[in-house]
Amino acid sequence: MPKVALYNTEGAQVGEIELNDAIFGIEPNEAVMHQAVVTQLAAWRRGTHKVKSRGEVSGGGKKPWRQKGTGRARAGTSRSPLWRGGAIIFGPQPRSYKIAMPKKVRRLALKSALSDKVRSGNLIVVDALEMDAPKTKVIAGILNKLKVERKALLVTADIDETVFKSARNIPGVSPVEAVGINVYDILNHDKLVITKNAVAKVEEVFA
């Protein structure tokens, strides 16, 4: 089982923690992680784009000019796709961009992303994050002591309002509960800062 250092909120190492090998110690599968990110980004697309076709555009019921004798090209409607203000041929219509991905493959992608963070040394486990009231300065100080200088995903066991409200004001820091972690967020942040209880929750849910 992989072991990583366990830190307190002062940035000092207070021990080590063993991680579940089936979640944090597998060989990262880049292809599956890529597939998971593409699937997730596709699911976020609203797909509400819409243009009007010949049957939907208003007006154009009257023939612009007579069929013959004007010297101009024949025209049956002023809403032809060839005309300015006319309909659109084969334009975008509302659709769902969701891509199906088997549950086992999604789990493999998540485990690969977590294992990749462990391998690269970008997983930081904290014994606890406890605050009496929301205070951005406190969370910023903790991250600074942990030497987190870039984008970080802050994972707690459950939704902790004090931690979430404190962390969401810091640029590049995204708080999330353990059951809500996903491949895109893990890969999109340089560091993964996770509490000891959140590690147990992840291992319980995704093992």
UniProtKB/Swiss-Prot annotation:
Q: Which UniProt keywords apply?
A: Ribonucleoprotein, Ribosomal protein, RNA-binding, rRNA-binding
GO molecular-function terms, A-Z: rRNA binding; structural constituent of ribosome
Which region ranges are annotated with the description Disordered? 49-79
Q: Tell me the GO BP annotations in alphabetical order.
A: translation
Q: Tell me, what's a Pfam family for it?
A: Ribosomal_L4
List the InterPro entries. Ribosomal_uL4, Ribosomal_uL4-like, Ribosomal_uL4_dom_sf
Judging by the UniProt lineage, the source's domain of life is: Bacteria
Q: Per the record, what is one GO cellular component? A: ribosome
Q: Does the keyword Transferase apply?
A: no
Q: How does it assemble?
A: Part of the 50S ribosomal subunit.
Q: Which HAMAP family match?
A: Ribosomal_uL4_B
Task: Name the family.
Answer: Belongs to the universal ribosomal protein uL4 family.
What does the UniProt function comment say about this protein?
A: One of the primary rRNA binding proteins, this protein initially binds near the 5'-end of the 23S rRNA. It is important during the early stages of 50S assembly. It makes multiple contacts with different domains of the 23S rRNA in the assembled 50S subunit and ribosome.
Q: What is this protein called?
A: Large ribosomal subunit protein uL4
